[in-house]
Amino acid sequence: MKKRMIALALSATMVLSVGVMLAGCSGDPDTNPDPNEKENVSLVLWGPSQQQTMAEEMIEAFKAKYTDKNYSITYNVVSEADAAGTITTDVSAGADVYAFANDQLLVLQRAGALAQVGGSYLEDIRANNSASSVEAATFDGRVYAYPYSDDNGYFLYYDKSKVDSPETLAGILEDCAASGSKFIFDLDNSWYDAAFFFGAGASYEVTYNSDGSVNTVACDFDDATKGTVAGKAMIELANSSAFLNGDDNSITAELTGGTFGAAVSGTWNAKVISETLGENYAACKLPTFEVDGQTYQMGSFAGCKLYGVNPTSDHLADAHRLAAFLSGEEMQQKRYDDMQIGPSNTKVAASDAVKANIALAALADQAQYATAQIAVPGGFWTAVEAFGQEVVAKTVTTENLAEKLKTMADLIRASEN
């Protein structure tokens, strides 16, 4: 009797199993997906407005290369300079992949906004990019970003038919005044204003704790000699009739209006300036400036641009794939061809075309006077910008200069990131 009951139980179990198997083969699309159906993947990419058209072409190239998935990629304009301030407000709501300037790496890493790079992507970064750009993407021995340019600096553009003395700031202003043209300098932009402070010998230094948080910040921008020299030079520039405070839009407007004499900018403007000026197009290192009978060479920032991958992305592997593609050799070549953006990829940088590029040659010449844009105090940007704004507004004078410099330097020294 006991054996018969066991047999009946086994029979019932077998019938139930067969029923389940048959149900599984019923052809229900929800339970039996087509193995050939591609996964739909939506990604958001942030980058600067100047590169939007080019970036959209790159996106199409990415989709054409990777046909194993259906990619939908949206490009939103967020400049490299604004990336950290934007994404750290809510990392989970940020882009899957975003471009940023390398000085923001520590802030982004500490905020949990950067996924670490590993595997073949890491090997490719280290093998094919300049040592300085790899260093800029690295914190505590780990790589957190994909380098895509190594030209984040500035130098002098000028019209040879209007400027005969590009070596000195006084000569440039005199030539521009004589030709009825303008010298364009973004004097209320801290990135450019650093040229005067670095040129005068001023500096800052940040030390960090092991977790990336700030330990100490030192800054001598209010030094009685160094700070005063920089401040006086900025005041003198602002008072020149040939000076025009302006950004990229101002450069374009002066080119269009025929009143462009010279400008301090970077490689992203090389195409429009060279095409407009034609045979009168020229570029060189930044000029010297003179204060109280002493001559100083203008300094600058030097850095690179990177792509970061958001670790909260719903499609993390695909985000890494996109960042690697956008920063690879082929796309760095396209950036150079389309916008003359200087590559971090060593093979592209070694090409004859890049070596012969006038703007990149000027940037290379300025490099000896440049300060690496790494470990910049978080308060530097707003503090120096505010000082520059007051110089432009002519509320900074030689009489209150020491006070204004101290206010600026105190804000820098109070930096928390």
Residue ranges, per PLM feature:
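Conserved N-terminal structural module of periplasmic/extracytoplasmic solute-binding proteins
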Residues: 4-8, 18-104, 410-417
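Conserved C-terminal helix/tail region of periplasmic/extracytoplasmic solute-binding proteins
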Residues: 364-417
